[in-house]
Regions:
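GNAT-family acyltransferases
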Residues: 1-86, 91-94, 110-111, 115, ...
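Conserved acetyl-CoA-binding loop-helix of GNAT-fold acetyltransferases
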Residues: 89-91, 97-111, 133-137
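Conserved beta-strand-loop-alpha-helix junction that forms the acyl-donor binding cleft
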Residues: 122-132
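A SAM-dependent methyltransferase catalytic signature shared across enzymes that methylate proteins
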Residues: 138-142
Length: 163
């Protein structure tokens, strides 16, 4: 199986991705696969969180395979007062269907478990799709609906990982 790595995004990397993405491959030795950042609004949010002092392990990650950035995702922030974290992810269209999202999400679930998080949550569009399959494979269960400012109604998913 192909090794998938999740690499925390640094402030410097986020700034380059946001303002000078054409410089990223030469600076970091990683090719950006077109479409790796399906939700570009996540990048400024991640950059601001890092500048505000959110620890990198609770922010965004590059999903890499060999020397390519194939996706982007991670946590939306540190655990809340109830011990929950939320994850999100996207994979470049040309690299989908290869298990990369499942491998990345599994890595974040394991990281959350190691830090004593009680539950990992995620949201998907309200229809069966590859992302719902990723979450089901990892043991997430659908836990109702929520309203997303950009997407409207979404399905809420939860995986209990601690006590």
């Amino acid at each position: 199986m192909t090794r998938v790595d999740v690499v925390p995004v640094s402030v410097e990397q986020a700034e380059v991705l946001l303002h000078r993405p054409d410089e990223f491959p030469e600076r970091y030795g990683l090719t950006l696969v077109p479409g790796f950042l399906e939700f570009p609004e996540a990048l400024p949010h991640s950059l601001q969180a890092l500048r505000d002092g959110v620890a990198a392990e609770w922010s965004s990650y590059l999903i890499t395979v060999r020397d390519e950035v194939v996706g982007f995702g991670g946590f939306t922030g540190p655990p809340d007062e109830e011990g929950r974290v939320e994850i999100g992810y996207s994979i470049a269209p040309a690299r989908r269907g290869r298990g990369y999202a499942t491998a990345a999400a599994r890595a974040w679930v394991e990281r959350a478990r190691a830090f004593g998080v009680r539950a990992v949550t995620a949201h998907t569009l309200p229809a069966e799709n590859p992302s719902t399959g990723v979450l089901r494979r990892l043991g997430f269960v659908r836990d109702g609906e929520a309203t997303d400012a950009d997407e409207g109604t979404v399905w809420r998913w939860v995986l209990r990982v601690g006590s």
